[in-house]
Amino acid sequence: MPLSYQHFRKLLLLDDGTEAGPLEEELPRLADADLNRRVAEDLNLGNLNVSIPWTHKVGNFTGLYSSTVPIFNPEWQTPSFPKIHLQEDIINRCQQFVGPLTVNEKRRLKLIMPARFYPTHTKYLPLDKGIKPYYPDQVVNHYFQTRHYLHTLWKAGILYKRETTRSASFCGSPYSWEQELQHSQRHGDESFCSQPSGIPSRSSVGPCIRSQLNKSRLGLQPHQGPLASSQPGRSGSIRARAHPSTRRYFGVEPSGSGHIDHSVNNSSSCLHQSAVRKAAYSHLSTSKRQSSSGHAVEFHCLAPSSAGSQSQGSVSSCWWLQFRNSKPCSEYCLSHLVNLREDWGPCDDHGEHHIRIPRTPARVTGGVFLVDKNPHNTAESRLVVDFSQFSRGITRVSWPKFAVPNLQSLTNLLSSNLSWLSLDVSAAFYHIPLHPAAMPHLLIGSSGLSRYVARLSSNSRINNNQYGTMQNLHDSCSRQLFVSLMLLYKTYGWKLHLYSHPIVLGFRKIPMGVGLSPFLLAQFTSAICSVVRRAFPHCLAFSYMDDVVLGAKSVQHRESLYTAVTNFLLSLGIHLNPNKTKRWGYSLNFMGYIIGSWGTLPQDHIVQKIKHCFRKLPVNRPIDWKVCQRIVGLLGFAAPFTQCGYPALMPLYACIQAKQAFTFSPTYKAFLSKQYMNLYPVARQRPGLCQVFADATPTGWGLAIGHQRMRGTFVAPLPIHTAELLAACFARSRSGAKLIGTDNSVVLSRKYTSFPWLLGCTANWILRGTSFVYVPSALNPADDPSRGRLGLSRPLLRLPFQPTTGRTSLYAVSPSVPSHLPVRVHFASPLHVAWRPP
């Protein structure tokens, strides 16, 4: 007969009123391999091979990799981005505020001014892959919403726009490391020429032709080239070679189609620029053809913005405007839409500043698509950037590691009687500037509407030689496209034309979706909080990623602190969202926890999720191990607040490791659900003096409680770690002390997942809330009793205990970077790696 739930609780000594014998007899039984095996069989924990089909869904949990079907919202609003410009002299400003910075703070702030990203390999994808066809039924809507989002980011100074192979434009205030083209005159031939009078500054290519001519005639000196920097010594930071003058320049705008055209296209020049250009073309088309294996240069027209100035020349190259002169092919022909307005605005948009960049191809390195901003806000969209190539395969980059505060450290740090508020940093990632040299690696964009629609519609063929014909122009006309564009015209107006052109954008601020970004953000906010803490030593400021919290003794004090800190952050160029400032009172909500003076508990929404999970959890049905991963993820978060902690979940971990289905028996489910229905806070550790010590040998245990000594023997020899754990449990139950000295590192770590399962669960409950102090064996007063010698009494140790705040120390004082240590020697661990069903 399977083990009943009541018997199981009694076995684990979880019920107070059990008629069990003394702990010294009962606990060692739980370490018995035979008992653990019988219990595992009774609870069906060891039976991993099942023939019944697996269950792939439990409540909201599906397998880890089965994606939920995303829902497209045609009404999505593109969020607005403030003009974020982090001050370049951030270190000086912090020093004015708080005095000299520590080594650590300086190092962290230098890391992000500017951030650098140089992967060894980068895979370039065609522009067609720029916008992912994530919503097959809403292709056109998704295309324009995404293009509008990208345009918004570019206008806010978050993206660069690739103008030519070696130049980019952006909006917003420039940084010193962004070399403006106009200002590089000092290097003579090396510079891109500044704008000649009479040619609007909109044109990215026209003004630069003469300097191109000079280059191709004179050849480049080795130290010059499109990358030589305007300041000596700066060129090294760009990390790219100066290329000979035979470099091919392709604009982003392919003539009329998405393919790159290797011929000089005179007809595409705007009329008032054609004179300048023809002179240039006659030279370029010959010299470049000979020097670069038949590839000519293509210059594209960028129509000026003035109304009605679209000349015939520009129309012929623009897919959108070609419809104006063509005969409608049907009632759903796009020419009906294009003829709705006279002025469709420019084909292209240019930023306030033009800078030089390393050679950047008209390609992308990652795709983008839109999703809901978050589960609670489905009205706004969020851009997802997929740079997963940098996390896998040959292009993999190993990201730097950083400390995440653990629960106990967080509680020690924040569990206090302070009054709290949390600040919301708007678009935190987009505060940190990225060096332009990283642009070629982080490219996003789109191949233009014609190409995008052609790729997705079955009837059109993308053949380079067909794009000239009118018939081919109308291949993309369809009822669905026409209806979609008419609806979008109401929203975007003339911008439909702008967005239908191809574009390549690079990141000017760090993107989400690259493993470097969370690391840099964590470094940045922790350095800022460190500065704030030193400026206001009687208060507490703490951050994790973009979540910044401030604590002060009283509400009035907190409000004045809030004003001072907000003004300081604004002076650095950090944008706060005042509407989202939350005042928590004396219990802080942070990182999914509620932290008060009594300790820490999980937030209510997580508790509700757990209750829902147990309601939906099927009994006696094998559950797919991927679903188990989701269940363990949720339960693992709240495990430290339960009686038995992580050890209770070990059977689940074992099945995930074996990639086998797991079957919940009624008893095991009842045991877990009871564990999670009563959550106990994790309390703050207090400093104190340790006066209780435990030690063990494989055959016996010994305790030193004050001046009192105790010893005992085990019925059978036990593994040393198990014996030490039992001794610690006896010390806690005999003395009630919350501070115990031990010389065993495994007990000290308080990770009991590697012990026999029943013992691990019970020990976790007995030792919950206990702090351990390391005492070397030679000084351990319990060492002699454990060896059976009570006569020799060593002098009583008074070991001080100081609670740790882990790597998240309050003051950012850290040693300088250590020199490279030799490779460590790994010894085989005497512990089992994980719990396995016997």
From Swiss-Prot:
Residues binding Mg(2+): D424, D546, D547
GO BP: DNA replication; symbiont-mediated suppression of host innate immune response
Metal-binding as UniProt keyword: yes
Region (Spacer): 180-341
Pfam family, one: RVT_1
Site location (Priming of reverse-transcription by covalently linking the first nucleotide of the (-)DNA): Y65
Residue ranges of domain Reverse transcriptase in the record: 352-595
Record text about domains: Terminal protein domain (TP) is hepadnavirus-specific. Spacer domain is highly variable and separates the TP and RT domains. Polymerase/reverse-transcriptase domain (RT) and ribonuclease H domain (RH) are similar to retrovirus reverse transcriptase/RNase H. The polymerase/reverse transcriptase (RT) and ribonuclease H (RH) domains are structured in five subdomains: finger, palm, thumb, connection and RNase H. Within the palm subdomain, the 'primer grip' region is thought to be involved in the positioning of the primer terminus for accommodating the incoming nucleotide. The RH domain stabilizes the association of RT with primer-template.
Family from the record: Belongs to the hepadnaviridae P protein family.
Full protein name: Protein P
Source organism of the structure: Hepatitis B virus genotype A2 subtype adw (isolate Japan/Nishioka/1983) (HBV-A)
